[in-house]
């Protein structure tokens, strides 16, 4: 059976800040983004089901684990591991964090292919798992 991919995009607004170090010059104060998060799942195409997994199930999962978790929040203050000081709240780190939450909640037989976090029209980060 062929492998198929399904991508769902959600949006949320969140605030973050970077440490006052040379690599983050100019972005060390609190600032917000209207993030777009694209999550792509993969699995065996099931002709009887019409695809990889139920779209309402994926939509509900993203609503709970992404929008419900991050929308209106301050990443550095409200969301572990950022609030614990373990990770810097970058797009790359956010993509990895979303990956960890979504991968653990997918139905059997469905895998995660990519998490893409867009901070704006000209900046995005992707995580595709450890390869």
Residues covered by each model-derived region:
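Charge-rich, low-complexity N-terminal segments
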Residues: 1-131
